[in-house]
Curated annotation (Swiss-Prot):
It comes from the Archaea. The gene is folD. This is Bifunctional protein FolD. Keywords: Amino-acid biosynthesis, Histidine biosynthesis, Hydrolase, Methionine biosynthesis, Multifunctional enzyme, NADP, One-carbon metabolism, Oxidoreductase, Purine biosynthesis. GO terms for biological process: L-histidine biosynthetic process; methionine biosynthetic process; purine nucleotide biosynthetic process; tetrahydrofolate interconversion.
């Protein structure tokens, strides 16, 4: 029996609809939600991602400020721009597009962003709050995955979940979010020795390897009725693919996300939601 496709385009639109209403409410209070983006260099993929984020903001009524910097920008120069945005009361969210040129340090850069404007959820402050169940701004992809579970009414309590990623952007924040839902989470990575066996016993598999030459999730690696969330995206044999062979696993899984059209749209939608949250926080602090 074929499983159910978790359609990120449909779910992300439902998030955008809610955000659009929230934007209207904030504007009625005299607050104009604004996202500032910072792009360093001329990486074509990064430029495309930023354009997509600006387009999504326009759809829901969020104002954007675009800062394009030369690839030779120094750390001191980038720090100064971030500090200026931190002090700009008209800006509610700050997003520095990653990756950065090699002369710039990602940790130093993200640490400079005000936690109240950290719409990517990457500052050490917000990462710590997440571990303590107190974060208002959470990394967009992990929160997008959680939104997918909520949309389909998928219960996480007591579930055995294999999470194949340990990055600061996906694996670590998602681990905390799943743990908060009383799931049993096993984090796997490139040094995990019994990955296939762990996957075969999992109720839910969330995979974000991003290299089909190294890893492909197939139906023989999952149990009947498992749920598969594919966070990865890469180009393989001239196609955009995830980690999972979707057409194969959907014959065995109860739910699965396609690539493209799965988790990807959710990441942008949750960025919009975080921007609204940040704007709301700023209005509360200003009272």
């Amino acid at each position: 029996m074929t499983g159910t496709k978790i359609d990120g385009k449909v779910i992300s639109q439902s998030v955008k609809d809610r955000v659009k209403k929230a934007v209207e409410e904030l504007k009625n209070q005299g607050i104009n939600p604004c996202l500032a983006t910072v792009l360093v260099g001329d990486n074509p993929a990064s430029a495309t991602y930023v354009r997509n984020k600006h387009r999504a903001c326009e759809e829901v009524g969020i104002t954007t400020k675009d800062h394009k910097l030369d690839a030779s920008t120094t750390q001191a120069q980038l720090n100064e721009i971030i500090e200026n945005l931190n002090n700009d009361n008209s800006v509610h969210g700050i997003l520095v597009q990653l990756p950065l040129p090699e002369q710039l340090d990602e940790f130093t850069t993200t640490s400079r962003i005000s936690p109240l404007k950290d719409v990517d959820g990457l500052t050490p402050h917000n990462a710590g709050l997440l571990a303590m169940k107190k974060a208002a701004l959470v990394a967009c992809t992990p929160s997008g995955v959680m939104e997918m579970f909520d949309y389909h009414g998928i219960e996480l309590e007591g579930k055995n979940i294999v999470l194949i990623n340990r990055s600061n952007l996906v694996g670590k924040p998602l681990y905390h979010l799943l743990l908060d839902k009383n799931a049993t989470v096993i984090t796997c990575h490139s040094r995990t020795k019994n990955l296939v066996e762990l996957c075969q016993s999992a109720d839910i598999i969330i995979t974000a390897v991003g290299d089909r030459n190294k890893f492909t999730l197939t139906s023989d690696m999952i149990k009947e009725g498992a749920i598969v969330i594919d966070v990865a995206i890469s180009r393989f044999q001239e196609k955009l693919v995830g980690d999972a062979d979707y057409e194969d696993i959907i014959q065995k899984a109860s739910f699965a996300t396609p690539v493209p059209g799965g988790v990807g749209p959710m990441t942008v939608a949750m960025l919009l939601k975080n921007t609204i949250t940040a704007a709301s926080l700023s209005s509360q602090i200003g009272k």
